[in-house]
Amino acid sequence: MALNAGFPTTGFDASQGLLAQARRRHPEVNFECRLLPGLDGVMNASFTNVLCETVIMHLPDAEVGPSVARMLSLLIPTGTLFLSWRVTQGSDRRDDAGRLYVAFDGSAVMTALAGAEVLLDEEVVSASSGKVVHRVNARVSGTV
C-alpha cells in the first residue's frame, strides 16, 4: 500500500458501505465519499499519483471520458494516473451482486488522455480474477 511506502494516501469511493469496510481495514487512511466524474470538493493539482483500479467500467458510458479527464486534473505537473478497467465484451451487463459492467469503447479514455504522455497501454489477464483488464498509465506534462 502507498501509505506503507511513506506516501500520503487518500481513498475515494461513492459507496458508504465500501468506505466503512475500508475504514475498518485501514484506519490510518483518510477515506472520503466522492462521486465521479465531479469529485466535488477535491482540489485540482493536489495529488502526485492517482490510482483508479477497476472503477470506470461501473460508470455509465457518457461519464467515462469526463471521469478520466477529472482524474488527470487532480495531478500535479509530472503526476501519473494509474488506470485500469475490466474489459466487457458485447453489451452492458450486471453481475449477481447488481454491479454494472459497461461495455465501453476505450477510445473515450484515450481521448480524455490527450495532452498526457501515455506510458503504458495494455490488456492483461488478471491473476486474481482471470478476467481481461485494460491498464493505462499516463503522466501529466509539465514541470515541478
Question: What spans do the regions from the language model cover?
Answer:
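A conserved beta-strand element that flanks and buttresses the S-adenosyl-L-methionine
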Residues: 51
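Class I (Rossmann-like) S-adenosyl-L-methionine-dependent methyltransferase catalytic domain
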Residues: 1-43, 59-66, 70, 80-144
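Conserved acidic residues
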Residues: 48
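Short catalytic micro-motifs in class I SAM-dependent methyltransferases
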Residues: 54-55
